[in-house]
Every structure is written in C-alpha cells, then in structure tokens.
Amino acid sequence: MLKKCFIVRSIFLLVLFCLISSLFVVCKSTEKDNRMAWWREARFGLFIHWGLYAVPAGEWEGETRHAEWILTTAQIPVKQYEKFAPQFNPVKFDAKQWVEIAKDAGMKYIVITSKHHDGFCLFDSKLTDYDVVDATPFKRDIMKELSEECRKQGLKMCWYHSIMDWHHPDYLPRRQWEKRSAEGADFNRYIEYLKGQVKELVTNYGEIGVLWFDGEWENTWDQQKGSDLYKYVRSLQPNIIINNRVGKGRAGMAGTFDPETAAGDFGTPEQEIPSTGLGYDWETCMTMNDHWGYNKNDHNWKSTKDLIRKLVDITSKGGNFLLNVGPTAEGLFPQPSIDRLAAMGKWMKINGESIYRTTASLFSKLDWGRSTAKPQKLFLHVFDWPENGKLHVPGLVSKAESAYLLADPKTKIDIYYKYGEAVLSVPKEAPDSIVSVIVLEFKEEPEVVREPEIKAESDIFCNPHEVKLSSNLGNVKIRYTLDGSNPTSGSPFYQKVITLEKTTTVKCQIYRNGHAISNVVTKTFKKVDPRKAEKNIDLKPGLYYKYYHGKWEKLPDFNLIEPVDSGIVTRFEISTKERKEDFAFKFTGVITVPENDVYIFYVVSDDGSSLSIGDEVVVDNDGLHGSKEAFGRIALQAGTHPITVEFFQRSGGVDFEVFYSSTKITKQIIPSSSLFYPTKKSN
C-alpha cells in the first residue's frame, strides 16, 4: 500500500513539474513576445554611424577607402586620432530635422552610435572625458537631444554601443600595428567601464528601445561575458531589446545564431538579406553606399528602386530593415541619403500598410515579386507587372472576398481560380514603376499551398539514402515518381521514408480531391563512388603547417612564397601566429574517416580560406570578408585521405575554425584524433 502511494505521489510530482516547466516556457515566450511587439510591427529603422571619423571623411594620406574604421585601417596612433576631437564641431546638427527625415521616410526607430570602436562617445559620460561634451568645441549631448526629439515625434530611440574600444587603455587586445604598451592593462577593469557606460545610456535618457551591441568578435570577449552583459542590461531596463552581438553566438556577416543557447533577442545579417526567413527575429543592417561612416569620395549609391525592393524583400521574409546614414562632420545627412529616404517615404505613405505589422509571406516563391500578410489579408508586391494583364498567384487555394490596388482601393480586380492557383486580371499599366501592391481580403485566414519539400542529408550518397517528402498543408496527398516522369493522380502517394539505392530523380506534387494543386518539384540524388583511401602510409599525430607574412586580398599561391615559420600542430588552429593582421597559414596532413560515407566539411573564417581533399577543392571561402562559414561535400572511403587547409588574415576581426559531419557524425570541430601527418619515409 505504501509502495502504491509512493508511486502515485511520484507520478503526481512529475506531472506537476512538467506543468510548471511548460508554464514557465509559455510565460517566458509571452514576455518576449510582448517586449518584441513594437519592433516586429515597425519593420523599418534608421541606422546612424557618426563620430570623429567624420572629420577625415574617409581620406588619409591620399587613400580614400576609409570610414568609421579609419583609426585601424589607416593605422593612426591613438594620440594622433584624438586630435580629431577639437575639429569635431557639428554646428549644423539639428535633432529635429534628423528625426523628421527618418519619420517622413516611414521609419519607426533610430539606432545611433553612442560609441563606435574608436572609443569616442557621442554622449556626456561621467566615466571619460573622451566624449562630445568634454573633448570637442560642440559641448552638447547629442544623445540627449536626439532621445528627446524621438519621443516628441513618436519614434523609438535606440543605441548602438561597441564592446570593442581601441582608445581605452584597459581594452585588449591592442591593434597589431600599435606601439602602445599593454603593460598594466586589465580587461576586467574595462568591463566595469563598459557596464558603467551602458548604465548611463539606459538610465539617463528615458526608455530605450534597442541596445545594439557590436565588436564582440575578439578573443577577449566570450559567451559568458555576453550573457552577463545581457542580463545586466535587462536588469536596468526589463523591456529593452538586445541584439545577438552581445555574445559570441553570431555566425559572421550572416548574423545568424541559435536563440535557444546564445544571448540576444534577434539576429543581425550585415549587408546581406537571407535567402529565406530565419525562424526567429532578425534585422538586416545595410549601407546606402559602400561605407557606414561618412566618406566624401564614396558615390556608389544604391538606387531608390533597389532600396524599396530590399525593404519589401526583407519584410516578406519576416525581417526588419535598418538602413544606414553617415552624417558629415558638420552634422548634415549627405544629400543623396536625404533624397533616397524622401523617395522611400513617398512610397511608404501609399503602401506602408503592406509593411507595418505584417508577417512573412505564405508563399514559397513568387516569380514576379513578394508578399506579406495580415489577419485575413494578403499583400502582393509586384516587381514585374504582367504585360498580358494576367497575374498568376501559384498556391493560393482560398477564394478572396475582394481584390484591389492599395494605391487606389476603388480599382477592383477580378480573380478566377484554377486548381492550385489564382489568376488576377490587372490593369495594363503598373500603378507604381518600382513596386505595385495588390490587396486580397478573405473571410477567414487564407490557405496557401507551398511547393512540397524533398529533404535528404545530401544530394550525393554512397550508402542507402533516405529521402523525405513534406507539405505545409493537411488534407492533401503528396504523389511522387522515381523514374523521371511527372506525377499523376495514379502515382503512389507518400506514406513513409523513401530509401534510394541508385542514382534517382525524385519528382513530387501535392494533390487534393484528385487534382494537382502545386507545381512539380524535382530533385536528383546521385550515387557516387567514394574517394579511395590512401594505403601504406606511416603516420604520426598532428598536421604540418607553414606560416607566412604578407598583404593579400585572396589566397596566394603559397608555392611562390617563403614561409616565416613551420612546424607541427595537433589540429587546425592559428595560435602560433606572430601578428594579428597580414598573415597566412597552410596546413597539410591526412584525415582518417571511420566508414564509407558522404562527409561535409565546413570552414569558418575571417578573412579567406579553402579546404581540399587530395586535389579536389571541397570548401571555397576565399576573399576579404567578415567571419563567414562555407561548406562542401565529398564521398570518402573509410581510411586515410590527404587534407589541405589554407587561411589568410588581412585586417580587422580574425576567425578560423574547421568542422566536419556525416550521416553518423554530428557537426563538430575536426578532432586531433583524426588528424595525422605522413613521415618522410611515407612521403
């Protein structure tokens, strides 16, 4: 009896624990949703990069490629860079005008550099004299004026703040070219300074919408420090939103991260737009020309058409668009920036309903443009207006109650339906030469059938290969073929995983009530012979490496260069480097793999890299870029294979990691236990 009571009590406690855990997850999710609500509705914001770097305006000693990074890209000593402060006197700065320009453009929030990597502060900090009030003749707290004006005009004020600080004596590491001593520097003391300034920013200027961190990539910063800073900021302003650059979870310029394990509320793609949505909150930040800070010689401006279509593209994928302006040292927005923002505002005044408070497209692909959604409403953003007056909307199953032009609601549009698509009879001329918007209204939430998905670990295989088919809708059947023919109503319908033994072309299509309601999707899976393993090689643990000095924009031909150093390392790592910039490594050796399989190799690097197995280049991640991951696949026989990895670093951030995975190996850094080098006898 006691045993039975104990079991019942244990079950009750287990169920209670599960319920409490579920409730905690729901409450946590609801809290974040409430906090993120205004940001998700806004969709469009203004980024401002402004500081002492506006004084040289991108030019130093005849070179005109610089901007906000000029201290390090032009290698200007800190004491010399400080001389820009007395020259920074932006007497034409007008907070009211800046906010009006953003508001008229249709932007809902402003993010400005309170401090960039150069360490100079645009606010009155009590922790340093290296700020706009104490170090410049301007003597005005720019952040105070902007925050007050944003509140007056109904925009959210947000801060960009750099974790990296090239000016502060306790920040480490020093720049590779610097002669400034690091003796006595204390990074923990710098963290206290960083936290102190963050506290000033989130307690002295009222409610702040977003704290947009940056400069987190150097090895003195880590995930724990990022998590601590995230929690600290939220303790000061619980409703503030913080980007993913507070910690170390960001995957380079792609800006992606795992929101379940890394600190931050949203991803930050930089100068790029993801090909699809990311499954979590994200915001693309982008320049109008080629620089963030003001560069007087940069006239490579994106067109208004390009910028408006980028805004639509980003919104259709569930993201926000943070568009940058780099003001002059006088305090003015460059005229080309003003012109483009005004043109975007003109479009937004007519079409803003299709951007604000919308969610991502329900369609997998629209050849003529993009789409956004609201409850019981779809917005069709037409880039390419049909010359024949017929706009085909593939996948739209639900019948609309009405259809009309957003620019002219009185212009009604007729629709007729075929299985799996709607056809709209539109006016001959596009209402807008850049993007025309059509509104579809429904009684209930619209049903859109996406193309079926064909999923597998890889497009090539050497062992029996599993393929899965899926649809976004219920009450449908996926019919498929494996012989290259198109599916019909008589083709088998998908019920379980398909196993392939030979090269096969899989075709599938979604059916409902005996009729096809989607396009045919095709994917070919190729059976390949794995690369033969090397035999009779005498091996020792480790890898050969050669180390080089030089300035490159892409991987050089290392056969033509003399190395500075060489030796043996246990894995792919660059700790033996002698400088922080302008160096390269070449690693050679062999990798052992446990079984015949398709292996995926990944290289994360900043700057360029490549990975080869034998003579085949598997990963090409070359060129100048921020931290970026590239990958490639190759079928390998169990055993030993030659591997070569090359990497170069030009300037700025540095990153280098090599991973692999297979159908039975989860993605991981290639372990030292799998890496060897052949002895001279073997060579």
What does each model-identified segment do?
Residues 2-13:
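Bacterial N-terminal signal peptides that target proteins for export
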Residues 11-22:
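Bacterial N-terminal signal peptides
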Residues 28-453:
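Mature catalytic domains of secreted/periplasmic carbohydrate-active enzymes
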Residues 48, 52-99, 104, 528-595, ...:
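Extended carbohydrate-recognition surfaces in non-catalytic/accessory domains of CAZymes
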Residues 111-114, 469-471, 591-593, 597-611, ...:
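Aromatic-lined ligand-binding clefts that engage carbohydrates, nucleic acids, or primary amines
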Residues 387-389, 501-504, 595-601, 638-640:
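Short tyrosine-centred short linear motifs in exposed loops/low-complexity segments
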Residues 444-544, 552-556, 562-586, 598, ...:
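Short, compositionally stereotyped local motifs that mark structural "simplifiers"
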Residues 644-653:
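Short beta-strand-plus-loop segments that form exposed binding edges in beta-rich domains
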